Amino acid sequence: MKKIMAINAGSSSLKFQLFEMPEEKVLTKGLVERIGLPNSIFTISVNGEKITQTLDIKNHEQAVDMMLDEMKKHGIIQDINDLDGTGHRVVQGGDIFETSALVTDEVEKQIEELCELAPLHNPANLMGIRAFRKMLPNIPHVAIFDTSFHTTMPEEAFLYSLPYKYYQDYGIRKYGAHGTSHKFVAERAAELLDRPIEQLRIITCHIGNGASIAAVEGGKSVDTSMGFTPLAGVTMGTRSGNLDPAIIPFLMEKTGKTAQEVINVLNKESGLLGISGISSDLRDIEQKAEEGDERAILALDVFASRIHKYIGSYATRMKGLDAIVFTAGVGENSDIVRARVLEGLEFMGVYWDPKLNAGLRGKEAFINYPHSPVKVMVIPTDEEVMIARDTMTFGNLK
């Protein structure tokens, strides 16, 4: 029995989950928010009950220290030596990390070098890794990369039609994201279908505030919608998804904004929020659409239409399709979005049952008619359990 921590460190937050492995039993989970700001919030789950404290937590090291103290205080662990390993989500692994990796000084340095490809995420992920390595120097720490699952994409899928030297010199290519989630639900889909994953062609739809679609053929990612950064692909909560790059200099000229300011608009003020003018939260938009708000209806139409395009494209890419999987906050909980995405796909052999779809929230289920050649599933994602599994494997803890 091993105790493994799954960690997701943000610039001012630290999300943690403690597993007993290999049973995959969750012993506790929690969240530290507003690190480095006044009135930081520390939340931990003890016997299913949330305990929250407000205090000042200066940095990630202090957050880790407090987390360990609280786990001891509540009897979740007797001593820090009870912990056998930690696994850390890292957003960008470039084309260096095809799998998860045991963190060494060299690996840490490589993650730092990749910060320019994910300036919003990798520096924060690295802060978490450094804090845990300092506090717990005698156990293995493993980095689990969002991009690793997508390193199996062929060159024709990941390359942009730019001068080839930009790829050689600067690493400009499609990297994708949400790889841990796409991998988890694709593998789970194969289990539910009771078929070897090597025989399956699956489209996984990770739809949350950030969203990406992946083509998974024979258990490997062969294409995905996010690109060089998580700004590309389908319409998202506040992100634009794909657009004509000439719009950027055009907007700079028209608005007087710098390139970075325009990128901020594309990242934070666009997507569902930009089109609807209401919210980036799909629940708010669905409610307004039901009330007949035209912009809310339009936002939903655009959202579904972009996902449609990827499903059609990826089914063509794989020369057929066995299953479509919905996951993440919206994919698991919005029957409205699922219905809009599935509408009109009968020509591809997708026959979904509106009764099975209606009201389904956060549960694992098939939502297709029995005779449907293409199966449609809702599978709640569990990135933390994937992090714990890889920590066992790459930390040599099995």
From Swiss-Prot:
Alphabetically ordered keywords of this record? ATP-binding, Cytoplasm, Kinase, Magnesium, Metal-binding, Nucleotide-binding, Transferase
Q: Where does substrate bind?
A: R89
Give the E.C. number(s). 2.7.2.1
Where along the chain is ATP bound?
A: K15, H206, I207, G208, N209, G210, D281, L282, R283, G329, V330, G331, E332, N333
InterPro entries from the UniProt entry: Ac/propionate_kinase, Aliphatic_acid_kin_short-chain, Aliphatic_acid_kinase_CS, ATPase_NBD
UniProt superkingdom: Bacteria
Cite the GO molecular-function annotations of the record.
Answer: acetate kinase activity; ATP binding; magnesium ion binding
Q: Name one GO cellular component term.
A: cytoplasm
User: One biological-process term from Gene Ontology?
Assistant: acetyl-CoA biosynthetic process
The pathway noted for it is: Metabolic intermediate biosynthesis; acetyl-CoA biosynthesis; acetyl-CoA from acetate: step 1/2
Catalytic center residues: D146 (proton donor/acceptor)
**Cofactor: binding details:** Mg(2+). Can also accept Mn(2+).
Report the leader peptide range: none
Please state the protein's primary subcellular location.
cytoplasm
State the HAMAP family in the record: Acetate_kinase (MF_00020)
Regarding protein family, the annotation reads: Belongs to the acetokinase family.
Query: This protein is called what?
Result: Acetate kinase
Q: Which organism is it from?
A: Macrococcus caseolyticus (strain JCSC5402)
